[in-house]
Curated annotation (Swiss-Prot):
Keywords: Aminoacyl-tRNA synthetase, ATP-binding, Cytoplasm, Ligase, Metal-binding, Nucleotide-binding, Protein biosynthesis, RNA-binding, tRNA-binding, Zinc
CC terms in the record's Gene Ontology section: cytosol
GO molecular function terms attached to this record: alanine-tRNA ligase activity; aminoacyl-tRNA deacylase activity; ATP binding; tRNA binding; zinc ion binding
UniProt-recorded name of the protein: Alanine--tRNA ligase
PROSITE patterns membership: AA_TRNA_LIGASE_II_ALA
Complexes and interactors: Homotetramer.
Subcellular location per the Swiss-Prot or TrEMBL entry: Cytoplasm
Main function: Catalyzes the attachment of alanine to tRNA(Ala) in a two-step reaction: alanine is first activated by ATP to form Ala-AMP and then transferred to the acceptor end of tRNA(Ala). Also edits incorrectly charged Ser-tRNA(Ala) and Gly-tRNA(Ala) via its editing domain.
Comment, domains: Consists of two domains; the N-terminal catalytic domain and the editing domain; the C-terminal C-Ala domain is replaced by an unrelated sequence in this strain. The editing domain removes incorrectly charged amino acids.
Catalytic activity from the UniProt record: tRNA(Ala) + L-alanine + ATP = L-alanyl-tRNA(Ala) + AMP + diphosphate
Amino acid sequence: MSKSTAEIRQAFLDFFHSKGHQVVSSSTLVPNNDPTLLFTNAGMNQFKDVFLGLDKRAYSRATTSQRCVRAGGKHNDLENVGYTARHHTFFEMLGNFSFGDYFKHDAINFAWELLTSEQWFNLPKEKLWVTVYETDDEAYNIWANEVGVPHERIIRIGDNKGGAFASDNFWQMGDTGPCGPCSEIFFDHGDHIWGGPPGSAEEDGDRYIEIWNIVFMQFNRQSDGTMLPLPKPSVDTGMGLERIAAVLQHVNSNYEIDLFRDLIAAVADVTGATDLSSKSLRVIADHIRSCAFLISDGVIPSNENRGYVLRRIIRRAIRHGNMLGAKETFFYKLVAPLIAVMGPAAAELKQQQAMVEQVLKTEEEQFARTLERGLALLDDELSKLTGDTLDGETAFRLYDTYGFPVDLTADVCRERNLKVDEAGFEQAMEAQRRRARESSGFGADYNSLIRVDSASQFSGYDHVQQHATVTALFRNGEAVDEIHAGEEAVVVLNRTPFYGESGGQVGDKGELKNATATFSVTDTQKYGQAIGHVGILTTGTLRVNHSVEALVDVVRRNRIRLNHSATHLLHAALRNVLGEHVAQKGSLVNDKYLRFDFSHFEAMKPEQIRLVEDLVNEQIRRNMPVQTEVMELDAAKEKGAMALFGEKYDDQVRVLTMGDFSTELCGGTHASRTGDIGLFRILTESGSNLPGCTILRNLAIAGFSAFGSRKLSKRASEPSGRKFEPSVARQRCFSNGP
């Protein structure tokens, strides 16, 4: 009996766990602190800093099942979804990774054992072909001499993309940085399907399908193109779950695996479709996966960047539902079936089900108002065509007036063997695109970040003053041995009481002093495992290995502590008043105020704002102890502390509890008891005015600042009289900025 998709996912993770790999949870679809990516599109994304040497992990082997989206930007499969057997906007990438641990020998043998062993996937060895980079004799010999793959099924692939090292079998992170040859494994579906082996003229056929790519990171590419050997070579592999499921379930299309069969049946049920072979069913089944998980990870339909890609996918699905005869809103009804088929991989989505359904329903209702009129206009324009191309001006008018993304218009044209003048459309969109580029952070130079090999010990939970040693100095981003009076710099210490900005909490300010020098700290940031003190040397000279006294601005730190603890109470109160679907989407905690962004269906009513504020102050009056405990991440989850997407967690996490009201993961500084906060007041509540947007923002103050301040206008005139029973609000602090 064939394994289910869920069983295949688990078997992959179990296999590599048995080989000493740490099983790491999927990261968010919105890349964490990586402005170079629109969406997470590969398993290695969450380990990018590790491969670049900017971050270190407690483990040297890892395995994941990473949720990925390829739509928009450089990696865009959207237009092909529904027309091919293997293109998806959303997929899961199974991967195993070595960070300077094992290399080619083990990576290749692990892959072969998993694929061919009777205990695991038990694929026929004679059905497997492999490719290696043309000059990678080491990998070739391992496949041929150790694994025993016949020479005729090992294919060398050279530079087939027009330049040195430009090859299907040579992977590069960017123009510079880690890179290396790769070895791909293909499955032969048999001669009843057209296609040839990789490297042949018929390689684009469906007979030989790539199922696994094993990347050997062994070089560091320089700006002049030279390749320097990495001191510790690493391994990054990726295998599409849907592809290997198709192979193991003996079907030729990803859309025939058990997961998609169930989803397609659900789509047919909610749309009333009877032809289960319709490509529209495949489109919708694919799109509900990317849309639901993107919304769950905090992306909201909009007209910019990630939000616009999401809107395009939603509207393409709605249009295909229209083609199937759906008369009412249907797309949001697929969230529940999706959760059912995804199983444990949808645990976070299940927690946000109500919000995801509401966002999808609102977006569908909005688009439904213009869909029919837009389609009528498009039909009219296409009927007038004398050639085979719709002009870009009309495509832009459909976008601007009726909300038709250009790929939706192209989809309609494609079904009639017509094209869209996309160059003309882009010309009409030039002003909007320029503004989007100017507001976008994508494409930042990752190599400009300060790199620190050493680590700093943080002592700020218990101390605000600490004797320490300077371990590194940076001026203008470059490492130096000394700095002089008047120079701005970043100072790294071996230990420090200064809190580095993270979790929404700003960095500390203060001074670093010794007998001959004073450094004014205006900010504190994290650089990998090190803590950097940003500021200016006001007197003297400071050198590496100098001793200093690190002095935190205590008054400012205390105000931040109170605001941070109040933020946790606010989150708990929001979940109590509005519902458990509320999830934190961003925060800012400084010495003046706290700002808290969260998900909800609609703007808060005045009486709800009053209830939240009153509930927070009730918890302050209870004067509950604020306690912290360091434990394993899994133990923290069992304790009730929810770890959501968007934050990187170490194996050991800090759990913060406030009586019976709040339990969460947080590395920030806090009050000792809730009563220390004194008073809490909400100043403003706002949200985006984009239709379908459900991210709200509270601006609030706590402590001495709250006394004598004016309350939020437009308040409910009378208390509601609602009585609350304290409940554990499972939450955590995000590092999202403003």
